[in-house]
Amino acid sequence: MRIMVVDDDSERRIILRQSLEQAGHEIVAEVRTAMNLPRLVVELQPDVIIIDTHSPDRDTLEHVVVISQDAPRPIVMFSADNNSEKIREAVRAGVSAYVVDGLAPSRVQPIIDVAIARFEELQALRGELQNAQTELADRKTIERAKGLLMKRKNVDEQEAYRQLRKMAMDENLKLIQVAEEIIRAAKILL
């Protein structure tokens, strides 16, 4: 697994590097700050990002947000800060696993595994949400097109839907595509 490490403490970075290498991981980058993190993530394409910090600062969390939006991947944060608000901020920013007190070499791999599992679950939920939102928007568009057909052709809802389906089949298009065309045509005519 390709891992990027962000840690301003050279001693901890060495411990982390040794733990990761012993587990068979490739360290693609070791950086002291999160300053250029979004750019480096795009360039180096790590599978996982590990951030070791005394306490996550605003800049680090903002960079995590950018990564989570533009190039999502599991992010593990080791920190000495056990403030519950800081933990919530980090998780909201996109941290998959926030670990307080303990960069023990034996714990690194299980923590990475948890972060990956949590990240994959969250990505699946986001995908489901996106699909549901798209489906709802499509239904609204189809209903609107149906309403236009009902009004224009003076037919009932069932007949308008049948005509929409027939147009889609005749043109070898999806129902939503036909509905969008009807709405566009209606805008032009009005």
Where does each model-flagged region fall?
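Conserved acidic segment of CheY-like receiver
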Residues: 1-11, 16-20, 49
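Short hydrophobic/Thr-rich beta-strand motif most characteristic of the beta2 strand and flanking loop
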Residues: 24-33
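Conserved phosphotransfer microenvironments
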Residues: 33-37, 47-67
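A short, hydrophobic beta-strand element within the central beta-sheet of small alpha/beta folds
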Residues: 73-82
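C-terminal output helix
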Residues: 85, 103-112
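C-terminal output/effector regions of signal-responsive regulators
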Residues: 127-190
